[in-house]
Design a protein with these regions (language model features):
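Pore-lining transmembrane helices
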Residues: 2-365
């Protein structure tokens, strides 16, 4: 046992929730962002502007999402070069096979399959890396065979499970928009602020439609909410870094005083059902957009692209293109910016008044 521990340490193979559930998951979301999400935005712009070249570029970028996610995961796991490059093949296979179900239908588990399988393949590759004199053959061979083999065995099952969870969430939101609006908004909003990836969660379970809209609401409540709530401490720099960056910057302060999170959580519990019940706000762009909030305005761009040209996942879930009017635009602006700012500011005033939030509690270093 001691020899195994020594070997794993030498190979930098650390089986931990942080490395797999935070580092790898977050990197996967970045890979998805740099391929599928950017590709969708570029393709939509090309279609709207009549520029075939942009449509072609967007298609190429989207097609590489599996490879991009797997390579990003390998980078997070500190995989050596030969393993990292081999993961491109693993990601392609896992994403393709995870996008099917056990009965051969269309599945939503591509990103989730890539996450699980790329982690295992990367660690297998790291284990054999530089252990033989024919490393240039053995390392990619082990990485690719392990990854593609697991993809063939497990990816369709993962696709089936992810599809089932996503379908239940979407159907429940359609049937109970008030309750699920609160639940989805609060959970995804908290996931965005925690050091895990809300974007990857939304992508893994293909959250589109009303559930996607509730997720956007929750993320915006945290990002815009914390930006406004902490304005007196952090001024304009904090407003920008949190408002269109990430509310995760407040995680250290939340650990020191968890009560500073209450305004954002309460705000998300209000804006979520307003999004689902009043404005019927649907996010039918790439599912990853639902977990991005106002980060680079990706959530809002996702809603817009979903209006004009719904993503493949949204179409599979019954989404359809619409021509947005003043009501839709008003809903998007209110849910994304106005309500989170106003509500979180008001809740913050109350909590400061009763002494739950003190001067400096929200200051960013």
């Amino acid at each position: 046992m001691e020899k195994i521990k020594t070997f794993l340490k030498r190979k930098d193979i650390a089986i931990s929730a942080k490395r797999y559930g935070i580092d790898a998951l977050g990197a996967m979301a970045q890979g998805l962002f740099c391929s599928l999400l950017i590709g969708t935005i570029v393709k939509t712009l090309g279609e709207q502007l009549g520029l075939p070249f942009l449509v072609e570029v967007g298609g190429y970028a989207s097609a590489m999402s599996g490879a991009a996610m797997a390579v990003a995961i390998g980078w997070a796991l500190k995989a050596p070069p030969m393993v990292l490059f081999s993961l491109a093949t693993v990601g392609y296979a896992a994403n393709a096979l995870g996008s099917t179900t056990l009965d051969g239908g269309k599945g939503a588990g591509g990103p989730l399959a890539v996450l699980f399988i790329a982690i295992i393949a990367a660690e297998c590759g790291k284990a054999v890396s530089k252990e033989t004199k024919v490393d240039i053959l053995i390392t990619p061979l082990v990485t690719i065979l392990a990854g593609v083999g697991l993809s063939a065995l497990l990816a369709p099952a993962i696709g089936t499970a992810a599809t089932a969870i996503g379908n239940v969430t979407r159907l429940a939101t359609d049937e109970q928009p008030l309750l699920m609006g609160v639940l989805v908004s609060v959970v995804i909003g908290m996931a965005l602020t925690l050091p895990i990836s809300s974007a990857a969660i939304c992508a893994a379970f293909s959250l589109t439609g009303l559930a996607g809209g509730a997720a956007v609401a929750g993320c915006c409540a945290n990002m815009v909410g914390f930006a406004v709530l902490s304005f007196r401490e952090n001024r304009w720099g904090g407003l920008v870094s949190q408002g269109i960056g990430t509310s995760m910057l407040q995680m250290g302060n939340i650990v020191r005083n968890p009560r500073i999170w209450l305004p954002a959580i309460l705000t998300s519990a209000i804006t979520g059902p307003i999004a689902t019940c009043v404005f019927r706000l649907e996010m039918n762009g790439p599912p990853v957009s639902a977990g991005m909030g106002t980060c680079g305005l990706v959530g809002q761009i996702g809603v817009w692209t979903g209006w004009i040209a719904p993503s493949e996942q949204a179409l599979a879930n019954g989404g359809a293109a619409i021509t947005p009017g003043a009501f839709e635009w008003a809903g998007l602006i209110l849910i994304s910016f106005v309500l989170p700012a106003a509500l979180c500011w008001a809740f913050g005033l109350w909590l400061r008044k009763i002494g739950w939030i003190k001067e400096g509690d929200l200051r960013l270093d």
